[in-house]
């Protein structure tokens, strides 16, 4: 009947779907949190997780990072079996660790080891924000300190990729002390002429930014990475003033003299190789020698 | 009169009663002295009970007491000829940290500490004891100076944390704290740190990489304030009381966790009841500490500090739980 044409269509209740979690790309497609374009995860990964449309640097899993900067097959992992305990008896902590272990396929929020980068041997630590937001507890601190000690013993440079929300609340003051532990290891390494390169990736905040992340002989960061000590919301609440759009981004830090360079992920390996080569010294010509 | 705290209410009432009876005895012609004596005995008993069973949250309240002695209060009582030095030589002078040289019963020392105020005016000047990067850089400058002239360093820790502000971020709050941790680890002179109030996170640790770390009995030291922990962990800042217990932030907790060396006993009711007596307690521990550390040479001091922090933390391998080293 004619009348039927004008009858409103039956309304359907909108059931909210699971919120999209662009930080943890799962499945075939990934949505870019910056430009909102949807792309094949496979292609994104092939592009080192740099958005094909806008250049946004998606968080990179530790294993992929290692693959992307080290020479193929050169990586040897340190302390792979080191895991967290629950020193404060914090309710639910063990379960959370277990869940993240399954989700990320990692034992903890940092992977350490050694390998070569364009032939230069080095010790490396890569943090992964998919494990407890990359937060630093006893294991993260200890693994990093040990990696620095190994670099020291073997007279290799130490390279770190940071990605962390800061100290791990569930390990309380022991997390805080990891800041001192890692910094002390770096100091000793530095005194003996060790080279330390820190590459800050999104996000690097709190206790991690206020310890080893900021202590590089060279401090680099990826474009757009959030880097800072206090959280933006906390600052807005205390100072009650408008913060600039680029506040606490890598570019903001560069402008304020806190970084040596902001480097695109596609150029990272090549630029790191340049720095390593200069430190390795001893060019072919040797004209300066008497 | 010092402000009373929540858990002290029963004591306050009893004290008032005793006072009332005393007043009454003066005006009326009755002898109540035996009554008063009894009540006073009960007060002493009750005091002992209350102060012996302080919860972590009670201690947080004492640590935050507005009249709790500050760094300058202790400097005045422990040292002579304190000469304050200002400025980081880069940007400015941060009054949330004080530092200078002093005489410790004949021993030249460098003293540095967070400084909060006891009233609003003083707190505004001191930024509530929450330093900016220039504060930490001033502290580091003074530590390096101490090292050059072979003076032991004494640090008083008393801050809610490093200041979370725009200017602080622009000037590199993270780097300033990190640099202090890094450089303190390498100092070739004795460093003794004493937590006298709140030890709030990285902002506290930036003066805390010492050979010995001591805490006043009612002070706290933690990765985040109880309120902050409650907000992050349970999305509810009003659960701070529970967080104070869960986070293990008291001197006794830190001793158990192997983070601090000695708990410095406080006068009954807390340091604010008698700063002079409290300073004497600190003096006793500080002397012993320095005496022990001054026997070590520079290299041994650096090594001792390194090992101290290296063993902090707990990890496991496979199924077996061991200490980090």
Swiss-Prot record, chain A:
GO-annotated biological processes: fatty acid biosynthetic process; malonyl-CoA biosynthetic process
Keywords for the protein's UniProt record, in alphabetical order: ATP-binding, Cytoplasm, Fatty acid biosynthesis, Fatty acid metabolism, Lipid biosynthesis, Lipid metabolism, Metal-binding, Nucleotide-binding, Transferase, Zinc, Zinc-finger
Pathway the protein contributes to: Lipid metabolism; malonyl-CoA biosynthesis; malonyl-CoA from acetyl-CoA: step 1/1
InterPro entries named in the record: AcCoA_carboxyl_beta, Acetyl_CoA_COase_Trfase_b_su, ClpP/crotonase-like_dom_sf, COA_CT_N, Znf-ACC
A Gene Ontology molecular function term of the record: acetyl-CoA carboxylase activity
A cellular component annotation (GO) from this entry: acetyl-CoA carboxylase complex
Cofactor: Zn(2+)
Subcellular location as annotated: Cytoplasm
Segments forming C4-type zinc fingers: 32-54
EC numbers on record: 2.1.3.15
Binding annotation for Zn(2+): 32, 35, 51, 54
Major place of residence: cytoplasm
CC cofactor note: Binds 1 zinc ion per subunit.
Catalytic reaction list: N(6)-carboxybiotinyl-L-lysyl-[protein] + acetyl-CoA = N(6)-biotinyl-L-lysyl-[protein] + malonyl-CoA
A Pfam match: Zn_ribbon_ACC
Cross-referenced PROSITE patterns: COA_CT_NTER (PS50980)
Biological role stated in the UniProt entry: Component of the acetyl coenzyme A carboxylase (ACC) complex. Biotin carboxylase (BC) catalyzes the carboxylation of biotin on its carrier protein (BCCP) and then the CO(2) group is transferred by the transcarboxylase to acetyl-CoA to form malonyl-CoA.
The family this protein is said to belong to: Belongs to the AccD/PCCB family.
Oligomeric form and interacting partners: Acetyl-CoA carboxylase is a heterohexamer composed of biotin carboxyl carrier protein (AccB), biotin carboxylase (AccC) and two subunits each of ACCase subunit alpha (AccA) and ACCase subunit beta (AccD).
Protein name: Acetyl-coenzyme A carboxylase carboxyl transferase subunit beta
Organism (species): Geobacillus thermodenitrificans (strain NG80-2)
Swiss-Prot record, chain B:
Protein keywords: ATP-binding, Cytoplasm, Fatty acid biosynthesis, Fatty acid metabolism, Lipid biosynthesis, Lipid metabolism, Nucleotide-binding, Transferase
Record Gene3D superfamilies: 2-enoyl-CoA Hydratase, Chain A, domain 1
Localization in the cell: Cytoplasm
Coiled coil: none
Reactions performed catalytically: N(6)-carboxybiotinyl-L-lysyl-[protein] + acetyl-CoA = N(6)-biotinyl-L-lysyl-[protein] + malonyl-CoA
Pathway assigned in UniProt: Lipid metabolism; malonyl-CoA biosynthesis; malonyl-CoA from acetyl-CoA: step 1/1
Record carries keyword Lipid biosynthesis: yes
GO biological process entries: fatty acid biosynthetic process; malonyl-CoA biosynthetic process
InterPro entries reported for this sequence: Acetyl_CoA_COase_a_su (IPR001095), ClpP/crotonase-like_dom_sf (IPR029045), COA_CT_C (IPR011763)
First-tier enzyme category under EC: transferase
Membrane spanning residue stretches: none
One GO CC term on file: acetyl-CoA carboxylase complex
Subunit structure: Acetyl-CoA carboxylase is a heterohexamer composed of biotin carboxyl carrier protein (AccB), biotin carboxylase (AccC) and two subunits each of ACCase subunit alpha (AccA) and ACCase subunit beta (AccD).
Classification via HAMAP family: AcetylCoA_CT_alpha (MF_00823)
Role summary: Component of the acetyl coenzyme A carboxylase (ACC) complex. First, biotin carboxylase catalyzes the carboxylation of biotin on its carrier protein (BCCP) and then the CO(2) group is transferred by the carboxyltransferase to acetyl-CoA to form malonyl-CoA.
Family stated for the protein in its record: Belongs to the AccA family.
Designated name of the protein: Acetyl-coenzyme A carboxylase carboxyl transferase subunit alpha
Organism: Geobacillus thermodenitrificans (strain NG80-2)
């Amino acid at each position: 009947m004619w009348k039927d044409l004008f009858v409103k269509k039956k309304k359907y209740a909108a059931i909210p779907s699971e919120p999209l979690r662009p930080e943890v790309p799962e499945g075939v497609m990934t949505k870019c949190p910056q430009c909102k374009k949807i792309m094949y995860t496979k292609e994104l990964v092939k592009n080192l997780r740099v958005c094909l449309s806008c250049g946004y640097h998606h968080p990179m899993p530790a294993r992929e990072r290692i693959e992307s900067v080290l020479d193929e097959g050169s990586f040897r992992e340190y302390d792979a079996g080191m895991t967290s305990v629950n020193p404060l008896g914090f309710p639910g902590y063990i379960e959370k660790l277990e869940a993240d272990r399954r989700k990320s396929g990692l034992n903890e929020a940092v992977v350490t080891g050694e390998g070569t980068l364009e032939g230069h041997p080095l010790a490396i630590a890569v943090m992964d924000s998919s494990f407890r937001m990359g937060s630093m507890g006893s294991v993260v601190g200890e693994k990093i300190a040990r990696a620095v000690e190994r670099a020291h013993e073997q007279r290799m440079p130490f390279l770190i990729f940071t990605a962390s929300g800061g100290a791990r609340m569930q390990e309380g003051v022991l997390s805080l002390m990891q800041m001192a532990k890692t910094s002390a290891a770096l100091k000793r390494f530095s005194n003996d002429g060790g080279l330390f390169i820190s590459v800050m990736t999104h996000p690097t905040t709190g206790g991690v930014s206020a310890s080893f992340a900021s202590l590089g002989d060279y401090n680099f960061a990826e474009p757009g990475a959030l880097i800072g000590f206090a959280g933006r919301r906390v600052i807005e609440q205390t100072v009650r003033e408008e913060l600039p759009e680029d506040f606490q981004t890598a570019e903001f830090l560069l402008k304020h003299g806190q970084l040596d360079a902001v480097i695109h992920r596609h150029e990272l390996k090549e630029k790191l190789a340049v720095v390593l080569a200069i430190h390795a010294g001893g060019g072919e010509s040797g004209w300066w020698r008497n | 009169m010092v402000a009373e705290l929540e858990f002290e209410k029963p004591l306050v009432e009893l004290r008032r009663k005793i006072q009332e009876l005393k007043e009454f005895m003066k005006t009326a012609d009755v002898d109540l002295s035996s009554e008063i004596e009894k009540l006073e005995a009960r007060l002493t008993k009750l005091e002992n009970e209350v102060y012996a069973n302080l919860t972590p949250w009670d201690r947080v309240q004492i640590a935050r007491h507005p009249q709790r002695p500050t760094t300058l209060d202790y400097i005045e009582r422990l040292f002579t000829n304190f000469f304050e030095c200002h400025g980081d030589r880069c940007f400015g002078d941060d009054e949330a940290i004080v530092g200078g040289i002093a005489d410790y019963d004949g021993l030249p020392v460098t003293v540095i500490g967070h400084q909060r105020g006891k009233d609003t005016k003083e707190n505004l000047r001191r930024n509530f004891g929450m330093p900016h990067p220039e504060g930490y850089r001033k502290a580091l400058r003074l530590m390096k100076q101490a090292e050059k002239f072979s003076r032991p360093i004494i640090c008083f820790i008393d801050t809610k944390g490093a200041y979370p502000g725009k200017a602080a971020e622009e000037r590199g709050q993270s780097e300033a704290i990190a640099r202090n941790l890094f450089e303190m680890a390498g100092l070739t002179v004795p460093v003794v740190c004493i937590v006298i109030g709140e030890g709030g996170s990285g902002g506290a640790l930036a003066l805390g990489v010492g050979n010995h770390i001591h805490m006043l009995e009612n002070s706290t030291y933690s990765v985040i304030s109880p309120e902050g922990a409650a907000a992050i962990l349970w999305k509810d800042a009003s659960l701070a009381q529970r967080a104070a217990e869960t986070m293990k932030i008291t001197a006794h907790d830190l001793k158990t966790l192997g983070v601090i060396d000695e708990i410095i006993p406080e006068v009954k009711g807390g340091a604010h009841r008698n700063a002079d007596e409290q300073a004497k307690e600190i003096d006793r521990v500080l002397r012993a500490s320095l005496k022990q550390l001054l026997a070590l040479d520079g290299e041994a001091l650096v090594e001792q500090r390194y090992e101290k922090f290296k063993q902090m933390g707990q990890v496991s391998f496979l199924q077996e739980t061991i200490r980090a080293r």
